[in-house]
From Swiss-Prot:
Chain positions recorded as heme b b562 binding sites: 83, 182
Subcellular location per the Swiss-Prot or TrEMBL entry: Mitochondrion inner membrane
SUPFAM superfamilies: a domain/subunit of cytochrome bc1 complex (Ubiquinol-cytochrome c reductase), Transmembrane di-heme cytochromes
Membrane topology recorded in Swiss-Prot or TrEMBL: Multi-pass membrane protein
Parts of the chain that traverse the membrane: 33-53, 77-98, 113-133, 178-198, 226-246, 288-308, 320-340, 347-367
Family, per entry: Belongs to the cytochrome b family.
Name of protein: Cytochrome b
Lineage of origin: Eukaryota, Metazoa, Chordata, Craniata, Vertebrata
Further remarks about this protein from its record: Heme 1 (or BL or b562) is low-potential and absorbs at about 562 nm, and heme 2 (or BH or b566) is high-potential and absorbs at about 566 nm.
Pfam families: Cytochrom_B_C (PF00032), Cytochrome_B (PF00033)
Subunit text: The cytochrome bc1 complex contains 11 subunits: 3 respiratory subunits (MT-CYB, CYC1 and UQCRFS1), 2 core proteins (UQCRC1 and UQCRC2) and 6 low-molecular weight proteins (UQCRH/QCR6, UQCRB/QCR7, UQCRQ/QCR8, UQCR10/QCR9, UQCR11/QCR10 and a cleavage product of UQCRFS1). This cytochrome bc1 complex then forms a dimer.
Length: 379
């Protein structure tokens, strides 16, 4: 079996990636989230596949087909809630994974980092088109508001929006194509994950100390497979608690009402994991400026490898940048809170301050603290 594992053309790839992979001996639990994201992706694809067997992407029947899944399909309610709450677990793991990358300086592996940003954007696109499918009030108005932002693009904006809609408003054509996108994008994400792993295994994994770990590596199996298994069990337990006891806690009550183009909800907002970007979008009074800020709020992650001037790898021995990092995390939580609040004083002001702070921390404060800490080392 051992000879087959090491010599068989297909098993050899699996062996080099998950069994005999040389892994730093000191990586902590923060490194578990990569494997947890893989599990989340598998759960989403499997539950999504079963939901797609019963869902109809037609404006007249989409809402009732989701109700039919919950009421008439065997364990349909469970599959639906695992899928909906699985998306939330996916984004929790994703945010922690990116946060760990920033904290421990994983962005120096620029190819892996940049593929990760593309993965993040693709996952956000998948979640957005998926949120439209139940065809509730918030699904419809969320799709209308977010796609309408593209009309801010000079010259081609209006044409582009109507092209995406497949008409002059969000309607049957929009729902059908969004279902097609939602079905195909997870498989594109899977392909990108393989590219992400390919680049990661070219350089080897980063580790908490930030030092070269080539002299101290252990095989991935059994050490980290068992460690990851614990994380997977905890993730599944959290997901089951969420899906069985609090299935609708992260959803929007407006989505229990079928989509009505003649009745606008009092407060249109996306799912909780987009609220930070939505708050940044709303904090700028100009439409085009808001759209640019929204895009930059994610693409700014690509600036980390370029703005990094530190002589040390990661933040483990850098107290000034550590403080700035945790301020950044707190600021993100404030933005998430503001994104879910109505557009009125004092929320608009807090949102504007938090949005300015978001970009200031990444572009100005972190590079400044790098320089200060480099000078402290010289003393």
């Amino acid at each position: 079996m051992k000879x087959m594992r090491k010599n068989h053309p297909l098993l050899k790839i699996v062996n080099h990636s998950f069994i005999d992979l040389p892994t730093p001996s000191n990586i902590s639990s923060w490194w578990k989230f990569g494997s947890l994201l893989g599990i989340c992706l598998m759960i989403q694809i499997l539950t999504g596949l079963f939901l797609a067997m019963h869902y109809t992407s037609d404006t007249a029947t989409a809402f009732s087909s989701v109700a039919h899944i919950c009421r008439d399909v065997n364990y349909g309610w469970l599959i639906r809630y695992l899928h909906a709450n699985g998306a939330s677990m996916f984004f929790i793991c994703l945010f922690i994974h990116v946060g760990r990358g920033i904290y421990y300086g994983s962005y120096v592996l620029s190819e892996t980092w940049n593929i990760g940003i593309i993965l993040f954007l693709t996952t956000m696109a998948t979640a957005f088109v998926g949120y439209v499918l139940p065809w509730g009030q918030m699904s419809f108005w969320g799709a209308t508001v977010i796609t309408n932002l593209l009309s801010a693009i000079p010259y081609i904006g209006t044409t582009l929006v109507e092209w995406i809609w497949g008409g002059f408003s969000v309607d049957k054509a929009t729902l059908t194509r969004f279902f097609a996108f939602h079905f195909i994008l997870p498989f594109i994400i899977t392909a990108l994950v393989l590219v992400h792993l390919l680049f990661l295994h070219e350089t080897g994994s980063n580790n908490p100390s930030g030092l070269n770990s080539n002299s101290d590596k252990i095989p991935f199996h059994p050490y980290y497979t068992l460690k990851d298994l614990l994380g997977i069990l905890l993730l599944l337990m959290a997901l089951m608690i969420l899906a069985l006891f609090f299935p609708d806690v992260l959803g929007d009550p407006d989505n229990f009402t079928p989509a009505n183009p003649l009745n606008t909800p009092a407060h249109i907002k996306p799912e909780w994991y987009f609220l930070f970007a939505y708050a940044i979008l709303r904090s700028i009074p100009n439409k085009l400026g808001g759209v640019l800020a929204l895009i930059l709020s994610i693409l700014i992650l690509a600036m980390f490898p370029l703005l990094n001037t530190s002589k040390q790898h990661g933040l483990i021995y850098r107290p000034i940048t550590q403080t700035i990092f945790w301020t950044f995390v707190a600021n993100l939580l404030v933005l998430t809170w503001i994104g879910g609040q109505p557009v009125e004083y004092p929320f608009t002001t807090i949102g504007q301050i938090a949005s300015i702070t978001y970009f200031t921390i990444i572009i100005i404060l972190m590079p400044m603290s790098n320089t200060i800490e480099n000078n402290i080392i010289k003393l």
